[in-house]
Amino acid sequence: MKIAIDGPSASGKSTVAKIISQKLNIPYLETGLVYRTYAYVSLKFKVPIQDIDKLFSLPVKVVPKIGKTEVYIEGKPVNEEDLRSEEVGKRASELGSIPEFRERINKLFKEIINNKQMVVEGRDAGTHIIPEAPVKVFITASPEERAKRRYEQLKELGYEVSFEEILQKILERDKRDMERPKYPFKPAEDAVIIDTTRKSVEEVVEEVLKIIHERSQSAELI
């Protein structure tokens, strides 16, 4: 079964997707982490973001596993903390605004997924990466709640950050993503939208599992 979990940044979609992967015992592809990996190698190897061919020639390997996505550069595992910095996040957002890059990375995702069962989480998951998925969930939350979550996440990693700056960046990114002339950010037409602002992780997971069960039965997948 293919499950697409989409939504804006810091909405809680990654946490939910990891748990769903563990509960169903199927691999998890965190597409945002892959974006950050290419952003990281762009900075590390000093490759301009416009040089798409060079970026995709770099030694990056993506391995979806139960409850996590592992990425390797030159055969070595990448420290996830290095991928969570503000600098890498900014570069990832810049890459995401380039249509050719999105086309290439979406092609890479499709090659990784192929016909395997997988939880695919990230922007465009239900609209462009696996639009054929029988289960599509769009997880969202208020900008303020998302900024609070991202602030707490970065503080735990030891970064000195400002809540106001994070909120402003979230608002700017939402606007930029929704106004993209190509690949505008929006839920798939048949996605179930879940607002997590006032819900616990456990509540959201149960809601998603219920949707999976219902969609699976209707699609005669169980």
UniProtKB/Swiss-Prot annotation:
The keyword Transferase applies. Coiled coil: none annotated. The keyword Nucleotide-binding applies. GO terms for cellular component: cytosol. ATP binds at residues 7-15. It holds the Pfam family Cytidylate_kin. One of its GO terms (molecular function) is CMP kinase activity. Its main location: cytoplasm. Keywords: ATP-binding, Cytoplasm, Kinase, Nucleotide-binding, Transferase. It catalyses: CMP + ATP = CDP + ADP; dCMP + ATP = dCDP + ADP. Its EC number is 2.7.4.25. It is found in: Cytoplasm. It is an enzyme of class 2 (transferase). GO terms for biological process: nucleobase-containing small molecule interconversion; pyrimidine nucleotide metabolic process. Belongs to the cytidylate kinase family. Type 1 subfamily. This is Cytidylate kinase.
